[in-house]
Amino acid sequence: MTATTDRGLPGAPCWVSLLTGDLPAAQEFYGAVMGWSFRPGTLGEDFSVALMDGKPVAGIGNVARSMGVAVSWTSYFAVEDADTVAARIRERGATVAVGPLSVGHGRAALAADPAGAVFGFWEGETLREWSIGHRGAPAWLELRTRDAFASAIFYGEVFEWATGRPDRCEVRYEDDAVMVRGQGHTVACLRGGGIEAAPDPQIRPRWHVYFCVDDVEKAVEAALAAGGTVAAAPHDSWVGREASLRDCEGGLFTVTGARG
């Protein structure tokens, strides 16, 4: 991490990272589509940090093959004690797949919730200037899952959401979705079927990362030209214009014209 760090709000998203199998190809793709530049990461030659206007946006790690996982964008949540969080995850029938491991000046782990959605958590300092919807960071994080209410209970218990503590995230139920708020703004959304509806078996649970672009259609054209594919064509959603894309190795992400 850089000198501008703090411990982060426990339970709130603190970073996103692409697990890729080809770092140079990933940098070329996202440079073309998102206009990012890159600098070496602090974890070795297999890692880099994506920058927008000189500000950190996301991490890229050339570790998908060595870890035996799919190429994917992963959302990380800040925690005070990685071992405690790992125990809570296991106690609730979910999986801690990797870690917690010492990484740089902190500890990281990868897990999957009971529905199979992969997420990470991080114990250590976080970038102070990185916050959902601000300064080039992702505009939005959304868990698409079969049962949003059940997922809210799981994550709420694991990350201590909705405990009434001022140093924790709060939860609101709006328009059949679970909105997670921290320090005065929305940091994540959990969306599935209706809150009281039966789970939707057609949904493949996953955390989706939304990146803001000036022009969704141009981003789609750039992705296709760079060897990516379109998972969902440009359309108007509840947050604005958006499209879902896969990079040249299949990593799924969404571009949106909405500013957080």
Language-model features and meaning:
Residues M1-G8, A12-G21, V49, A64-R88, A94-L143, R165-Q183, R191-G193, ...:
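Vicinal oxygen chelate
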Residues T2-A3, R7-P10, C14-K55, E91, ...:
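Core segments of cupin and vicinal oxygen chelate
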Residues G41-I132:
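Active-site-adjacent scaffolding segments
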Residues P56, S66, T186-V187, E196:
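Active-site/binding-pocket entry motifs
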Residues A58-G61, A188-G192:
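Short amphipathic beta-strand/extended segments with alternating polar/hydrophobic composition
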